[in-house]
């Protein structure tokens, strides 16, 4: 059976008081107390984004399944942008070393990992713009206002310590993500 197209879909996202939003040529800028996030939605053909009286309005006509999926993905992106500029995002990584002590340091826009399973070379992971990385003993904290940059930086750090050619059950050395949270919404233990 064929999926019917929706003739008209309109979704609204309320803009909180703490946030300033501007839209120019489908480039959305969200600025809040924790920073600014800019995202280009020019790839979204057939979806109209506009600002009106404290709301972001998204509209589309004759939406099939793909266009609906794109619309609701854009809504999720915008909500993540708003949450990030109000609260921010934080990822926690743990340094695991069973054989050789791993040393981790932040140098400019990269994280340097040395002495991983006794290697002499330094492994490097790129820190994306707007992301702050701090090393506290065996914990690494990655935080920022753009969830995509924070997540990619944490993934860069984790994948830079991937060990190839050894049994992962025995050589479990590396850096691993163990917790993700929205700053300010963390659970009290």
From Swiss-Prot:
> Which keywords does this Swiss-Prot/TrEMBL entry list?
Ribonucleoprotein, Ribosomal protein, RNA-binding, rRNA-binding
> Listed GO molecular functions?
rRNA binding; structural constituent of ribosome
Gene Ontology biological process terms in this record: cytoplasmic translation
Q: Which PROSITE patterns match?
A: RIBOSOMAL_L6_2
User: What GO cellular component entries does it have?
Assistant: cytosolic large ribosomal subunit
Xref: SUPFAM superfamilies? Ribosomal protein L6 (SSF56053)
**Superkingdom to which the source organism belongs:** Archaea
- Provide the function of this protein: This protein binds to the 23S rRNA, and is important in its secondary structure. It is located near the subunit interface in the base of the L7/L12 stalk, and near the tRNA binding site of the peptidyltransferase center.
| Family under the similarity heading | Belongs to the universal ribosomal protein uL6 family.
Its subunit composition reads: Part of the 50S ribosomal subunit.
The name under which this protein is listed is: Large ribosomal subunit protein uL6
The gene name on file is rpl6
């Amino acid at each position: 059976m064929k999926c019917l197209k929706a003739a008209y879909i309109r979704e609204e996202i309320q803009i909180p008081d703490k946030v300033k939003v501007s839209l120019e040529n489908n480039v959305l800028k969200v600025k809040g107390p924790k920073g600014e996030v800019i995202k280009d939605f020019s790839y979204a053909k057939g979806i109209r984004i506009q600002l009106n009286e404290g709301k972001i309005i998204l509209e589309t006509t004759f939406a099939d399944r793909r266009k609906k999926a794109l619309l609701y993905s854009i809504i999720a992106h915008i909500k993540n942008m708003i949450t990030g500029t109000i609260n921010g995002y934080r990822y926690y990584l743990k340094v695991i070393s069973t054989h050789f002590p791993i040393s981790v340091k932040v140098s400019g826009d990269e994280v340097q990992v040395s002495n991983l399973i006794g290697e002499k070379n330094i492994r490097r992971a790129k820190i994306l713009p707007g992301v702050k990385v701090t090393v506290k003993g065996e914990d690494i904290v990655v935080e920022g206002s753009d969830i995509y940059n924070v997540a990619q930086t944490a993934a860069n750090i984790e994948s830079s310590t991937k060990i190839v050619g050894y049994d992962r059950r025995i050589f479990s050395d590396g850096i691993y993500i163990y917790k993700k949270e929205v700053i300010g919404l963390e659970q009290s233990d």
